[in-house]
Each structure stands twice: as C-alpha cells, then as structure tokens.
C-alpha cells in the first residue's frame, strides 16, 4: 500500500468568468482529487485578485488553495486532468513537508490580520510624481 502524503494545490481560475462557472471549476478540481484517491482536508477560496503579471492576456484571477492527502503516484494523474481544464489559468501542486507546516504555523502566530482579502482588493500603492520608480 502506498503511503499518503499531504499536498497543497493552488489554482488560479479565470477571474473574468461568471461565478457559476468558477464554482463549477472549483467543484471539478475537488472531484478530480477525490476520484484519484485523494482526501481533501481544507479548501481556502481567496477570491478574485489582480495577478502579478498578465496570464494569457488576463490580469484578474480567482485564487484558491486546496489541502489534501494522496499517494505520490496519483499527483501526475491529477496534473494531467488539470492541464486540460480551460477555466484554469495556472495550477501548482506542492508537497507540504513538516518544515513548511512549521513555518506556516510560525507565520500565522506572528502575523496580524488587517482585514479580509475582499477588503484589500485593489489596494495598490503607486509612486507619486516626485518619487523615483
């Protein structure tokens, strides 16, 4: 029997799509993970955000993180299905090691929550005319 490990899948869905299509894409990602033998432990939907750079000429994406446990052999199968999903702009699956989990706990312990992601959406700092870029 294969040992299951903890993974995190981060997806960026096209933010220009309707909410129903985004919800369907999220359901599809979760269904693929479950169908391939994964067990989802948490889902964090961050929401629509401006991307750091244009992806396929699009600058708004819907971000979500899914933590799940699965065998190492099914990760390639999950990626194969996600690769051809048109609504996904990007995806990344990483193995969450004990060092990453410990670092995450320390960051959460010492971080200050300023507001929800929706409250901070679009808050960008621009240099004034007198400042150099």
UniProtKB/Swiss-Prot annotation:
Gene Ontology molecular function: small ribosomal subunit rRNA binding; structural constituent of ribosome
GO biological-process terms attached to the record: translation
Keyword annotations of the record: Ribonucleoprotein, Ribosomal protein, RNA-binding, rRNA-binding
Family matches, as InterPro entries: Ribosomal_bS6, Ribosomal_bS6_sf, Ribosomal_S6_plastid/chlpt, Transl_elong_EF1B/ribsomal_bS6
CDD domains: bS6
One Pfam family hit: Ribosomal_S6
HAMAP family assigned: Ribosomal_bS6
PANTHER family according to UniProt: MITOCHONDRIAL 28S RIBOSOMAL PROTEIN S6, SMALL RIBOSOMAL SUBUNIT PROTEIN BS6M
Role this protein plays: Binds together with bS18 to 16S ribosomal RNA.
Family the UniProt entry places it in: Belongs to the bacterial ribosomal protein bS6 family.
Protein name as it appears in the record: Small ribosomal subunit protein bS6
Species this protein is from: Chlorobium phaeobacteroides (strain DSM 266 / SMG 266 / 2430)
Lineage: Bacteria, Pseudomonadati, Chlorobiota, Chlorobiia, Chlorobiales
């Amino acid at each position: 029997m294969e040992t299951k490990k903890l993974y995190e899948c981060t997806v960026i869905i096209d933010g220009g799509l309707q909410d129903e299509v985004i919800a369907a894409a999220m359901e599809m990602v979760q269904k693929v993970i479950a169908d391939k033998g994964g067990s989802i432990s948490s889902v964090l939907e961050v929401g629509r955000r401006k991307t750091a750079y244009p992806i396929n000429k699009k600058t708004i994406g819907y971000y979500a993180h899914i933590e799940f446990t699965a065998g190492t052999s099914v990760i390639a199968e999950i990626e194969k299905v996600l690769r051809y999903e048109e609504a996904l702009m990007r995806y990344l699956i990483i193995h969450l090691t004990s060092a990453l989990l410990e670092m995450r706990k320390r960051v959460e312990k010492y971080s200050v929550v300023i507001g929800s992601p929706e409250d901070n959406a679009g808050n960008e700092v621009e240099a004034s005319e007198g400042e150099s870029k």
